[in-house]
UniProtKB/Swiss-Prot annotation:
Residues 162-172 have a biased composition (Basic and acidic residues). Acts as a sequence-specific transcriptional repressor in association with BCL6. May function in a narrow stage or be related to some events in the early B-cell development. This is B-cell CLL/lymphoma 6 member B protein. It comes from the Eukaryota. It is found in: Nucleus. One of its GO terms (biological process) is regulation of inflammatory response. InterPro entries: BTB/POZ_dom (IPR000210), SKP1/BTB/POZ_sf (IPR011333), Znf_C2H2_sf (IPR036236), Znf_C2H2_type (IPR013087), ZnFinger_BTB_dom_contain (IPR050457). Its main location: nucleus. Residues 147-160 have a biased composition (Pro residues). It comes from Homo sapiens (Human). Gene3D superfamilies: Classic Zinc Finger (3.30.160.60), Potassium Channel Kv1.1, Chain A (3.30.710.10). Associates with BCL6 through the BTB domain.
Length: 479
């Protein structure tokens, strides 16, 4: 008996297995460790390392240029003389198969040199950030140095693998081997809202005040930057200002002058002029004009907060954010605001006042925008739509969280066990398993729970509570 035919015009179904890619990568790593189907032996520092060509090609622009076409089919043993050190290459090989990069202050320079050699730009950037974050707590500000061009072959292939986030560019697309300066990096899509930005960016970098780290081929950290004097300052500033007008700022792998990079000043001002950084602590009191002082023997002024260099003191005034930009101050926490209405909304944080209430369910809010978002629950309005599956959401934050299901991203790893999570709040709840914290307390019976959902279930089952309201849990009966 045959199965019934599908009705005409019925919708199809596509199910995405978000863990499939990580499972495949894990299986490939297990095959590598067992030496199964490995088709190339890499000789790095005299040490043989077995691997799969397909994985190497997918992760490295250097290996793509070596193994592409028929010429790479017969390559069974590949020696890298004068290339990366074994202690720098081994972590990269593990990263290709596990998506986890292990860095320490001792191994980071070697990993950086190996990643540059293999044209793995995303790893190069991660090493730069790690090294910079390691030096900034010591009060040392690093500046870019002249970087040597990469030595591996860079013959342009006719085609290249598909580019994707978390994978390097093939030789034709790699900025590290191009002649022109690279284009500015696009913002991290995982840092689009403030919670993810705070976790991913602020926790991974001690500060963004210093310029990107430049590494010598020996892997030694570059020396501390210093302020130039006299003609040296004027010539450096003039050359850097002219280069900034011609095109974008070059990256850390290009040849840079010490004053050519552009980042954010330590005092919070955007860097729109050439600058130099030192590790000397300066007094941060006074107005922007008072904090600008002339450099000895030159016509340039430097900011005493962050050693920014400008052609005149008024130039620093426009860079340093002054108190006059935010005249409204909170008397309790000294926070400053540009508009009076923002200060009034902020005060409700201290007073606990919630003047805006929902006329349907009575829920109260301290900001009108929160009430407007809440009202969509009752009206059924869902203005934010997923372009992949068509699902709609009340809040844009819910849409951002939903999109991660399609991309398969899990950007939040547990620092204890390494388990990765799609959402920051899920990670916070998971960490309580390791810490033993149980912050949710049942008043009637004194029990503590690790998760709010456990408390809600307990209140419903044991105490007959109505937990379907955000205002409070109303216990209807006794235990």
């Amino acid at each position: 008996m045959g199965s019934p035919a599908a009705p005409e015009g019925a919708l199809g179904y596509v199910r995405e297995f978000t863990r499939h890619s990580s499972d495949v990568l894990g299986n490939l790593n297990e095959l590598r460790l067992r030496g199964i189907l490995t088709d190339v032996t890499l000789l790095v520092g005299g040490q043989p390392l077995r691997a799969h060509k397909a994985v190497l090609i997918a992760c490295s622009g250097f290996f793509y240029s070596i193994f592409r076409g028929r010429a790479g089919v017969g390559v069974d043993v590949l020696s890298l003389p004068g290339g990366p050190e074994a202690r720098g290459f081994a972590p990269l090989l593990d990263f290709m198969y596990t998506s986890r990069l292990r860095l320490s202050p001792a191994t980071a320079p070697a990993v950086l040199a190996a990643a540059t050699y293999l044209q793995m730009e995303h790893v190069v950037q991660a090493c730069h950030r790690f090294i910079q974050a390691s030096y900034e707590p010591l009060g040392i500000s690093l500046r870019p140095l002249e970087a040597e061009p990469p030595t591996p072959p860079t013959a342009p292939p006719p085609g290249s693998p598909r580019r994707s986030e978390g994978h390097p560019d093939p030789p034709t697309e790699s900025r590290s081997c191009s002649q022109g300066p690279p284009s500015p990096a696009s913002p991290d899509p995982k840092a689009c809202n403030w919670k993810k930005y705070k976790y991913i960016v602020l926790n991974s970098q001690a500060s963004q005040a210093g310029s990107l780290v430049g590494e010598r081929s020996s892997g030694q950290p570059c020396p501390q930057a210093r302020l130039p004097s006299g003609d040296e300052a004027s010539s450096s500033s003039s050359s850097s200002s002219s280069s900034s007008e011609e095109g974008p700022i070059p990256g850390p792998q290009s040849r840079l002058s010490p004053t050519a990079a552009t980042v954010q000043f330590k005092c919070g001002a955007p860097a729109s002029t050439p600058y130099l950084l030192t590790s000397q602590a300066q007094d941060t009191s006074g107005s922007p004009s008072e904090r600008a002082r002339p450099l000895p023997g030159s016509e340039f002024f430097s900011c005493q907060n962050c050693e920014a260099v400008a052609g005149c003191s008024s130039g620093l005034d426009s860079l340093v954010p002054g108190d006059e930009d935010k005249p409204y101050k909170c008397q309790l926490c000294r926070s400053s605001f540009r508009y009076k209405g923002n200060l009034a909304s902020h005060r409700t944080v201290h007073t606990g006042e919630k003047p805006y209430h929902c006329s349907i369910c009575g829920a109260r809010f301290n900001r009108p925008a929160n009430l407007k978002t809440h009202s969509r629950i009752h009206s059924g309005e869902k203005p934010y739509k997923c372009e992949t599956c068509g699902s709609r959401f009340v809040q844009v934050a819910h849409l951002r969280a939903h999109v991660l299901i399609h991309t398969g991203e899990k950007p939040y790893p547990c620092p204890t066990c390494g388990t990765r999570f799609r959402h920051l709040q899920t990670l916070k709840s998971h960490v309580r398993i390791h810490t033993g914290e149980k912050p949710y307390h049942c008043d009637p019976c004194g029990l503590h729970f690790r998760h709010k959902s456990q408390l809600r279930l307990h209140l419903r089952q044991k105490h007959g509570a109505a937990t379907n309201t955000k205002v409070h849990y109303h216990i209807l009966g006794g235990p």
